[in-house]
Every structure is written in structure tokens, then in C-alpha cells.
Amino acid sequence: MPRHKFATAITCIDGRVQQPVADWMKLHANCEYVDLITEPGPDKVLSSETTYVVDEIIRKVSFSVKYHESPVVALCGHHDCAANHSNREEHIEQINLGVQVLQSYTLNVRLLGLWLNEWGSVELVCDTEQREKLEVRL
């Protein structure tokens, strides 16, 4: 598998999230750099009707895909999110819905749904390359 220069991650602004997600992306998306697009509670935002915020996220993702040729985009939710007080199960549902919203924009990239758990470990929730929803232990 050829190594890509960039991948893209949509994460929370919470400083505990970026490094573990970037490290996971470098390993599992086979890239050198990760463009970070931050938004408070991005899983909740992308799974809701907040159109203007979604449009802004899509604008930034499109920039990363176009100019950095990012072939992989991940949406990540996390434990103890100040902007999204949902429980783990609700976060997982929002991540899956958010990935579906991203798919509707025809970005022509592999989309991943990620969950950063209470121990700071990244879990894969869904992967459009696998063409089916991964079952995550709830």
C-alpha cells in the first residue's frame, strides 16, 4: 500500500483528542500528516440539522482533499466531551450518522468513524471502505 502524505480528521477542539487521533490516523491511514478540522462536538454537529456549521466543515474537508490530496477523512467523537454530553451509545450513533452525512457530499474519499474512549484509545466505529457498519461493543 503506498504511503499518503495527508489524511484528514474532524475532531473536537478538546486538546486531549488531537494527538491520539493523529497518531492513530498516521498508523492506520498510512499517512505522514493529518489535517485537523476542529469543532466542539463534531459528531453531534454532523448528525444534526446545523447546516451552516456542517457547510463550513465540508468546506474545510474539501480544501484538505483537493489541495493535500487526502484520501481518508475521519470523524471522531470522544468520551467526556463538554459540547456533547451524550453517553457512549449515543456518540456511536451520532458518529455513524455523521459519516452518512459526509458520504452525501460525494467527497470520493474513504470515510472513517472513530471513538476516543475514556482511556484515550481510538476505536474504529465504521469504515466506508469495508462497505458495512462495524459492530462496536456497546
What are these regions (language model features)?
Residues 1-21, 32-33, 40-53, 63-72, ...:
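Divalent-metal-activated hydrolytic enzyme cores
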Residues 38-40, 77:
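Short, small-residue-rich loop/turn micro-motifs
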Residues 72-78:
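Acidic beta-strand-to-loop metal/phosphate-binding motif
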